[in-house]
A protein has these predicted regions:
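Catalytic cores of nucleic-acid endonucleases
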Residues: 97-155
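Non-catalytic C-terminal interaction segments of nucleic acid-processing enzymes
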Residues: 2-30, 34-38, 138-211
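A short linear hydrophobic-aromatic micro-motif
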Residues: 64-68
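Accessory terminal regions of nucleic-acid processing enzymes
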Residues: 43-47, 51-53, 77, 207-211
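Conserved catalytic cores of phosphodiester-cleaving nucleases, focusing on short active-site segments
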Residues: 54, 58, 79-81, 85-107, ...
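Short phosphate-binding/catalytic loops that engage adenosine nucleotides
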Residues: 62-63, 129
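A short, highly charged nucleic-acid-interacting micro-segment common to nuclease
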Residues: 32-52, 70
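Beta-rich nucleic-acid/ligand-interaction surfaces
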Residues: 72-78
Length: 211
């Protein structure tokens, strides 16, 4: 726990030279919450560092931002934010992906990562106006290209194949074909952790650049 706090203190020192005092002030309750969850052994430092850097990016763009927020039955999102826009409020949900693959999936890491990403998009995007994934620049998200298309342009047969693949990994809660047909991925936030830099990319642009 002491090491967790020390790492976050160092991160805040780095951030203080890159963002405004207003952003730093808004990050304090996020820091407090993550330290509390670390006391309970519910979060890990590599994941929390990315949450804070991404939160600083969202806050600087006008979002009131929370971390590790309950969203529904047995669901918790990594980052949630809302801001005023011309037509009302805009809600964003961001999920952090570090690239972790469990030992039991050592022989099929790509399939595991692809179905994990698919599950995240299908399950979480329904709770937001804008849904994004964030990942470090040294990891490549395995985003199915079909999910970067608008719902009307998605091939039903391709989605059915993706659903079948997902069922082998995620059965509780299950993913439906309807969710795959209507879900949305609106942005990818690429994080350079060492210098606390965030670059927002369109999902199609991300796939073209990294895959």
């Amino acid at each position: 726990m002491q090491e967790f706090q020390s790492d976050l203190e160092l991160l805040f020192t780095r951030l203080s030279g890159k963002v405004t005092g207003e952003v730093m002030l808004a990050l304090k309750p996020i820091n407090d919450r993550l330290n509390l969850l670390a006391d309970r052994h519910e979060v890990k430092i590599n994941h929390s560092v990315m949450e804070i850097i991404c939160a600083s990016h969202l806050i600087a763009r006008g979002y009131e931002t929370e971390v590790e927020r309950e969203m529904g039955e047995s669901m918790k999102c990594d980052l949630s934010g809302k801001r005023r826009i011309k037509d009302g409020n805009e809600k964003i949900v961001v999920e952090v992906e570090t690239g972790f693959v469990p030992p039991e999936e050592a022989l099929d890491p790509i399939a595991y990562r692809r179905t994990r990403i698919t599950s995240k998009i299908a399950r979480y995007s329904m709770f937001s106006d804008k849904f994004a994934l964030t990942t470090p620049n040294y990891h490549i998200l395995q985003i199915p290209e079909v999910l970067t298309l608008s719902p009307k342009d998605r091939d039903r047969g391709e989605l059915s194949g993706l659903l079948k693949e997902c069922i082998g990994y995620y059965k509780n809660p299950p993913i439906s074909l309807m969710e795959l047909m209507s879900c949305h991925l609106d942005a990818v936030y690429v994080i350079w952790i060492d210098d606390c830099r965030v670059v927002e990319m369109d999902p199609s642009e991300y796939l073209g650049s990294y895959l």
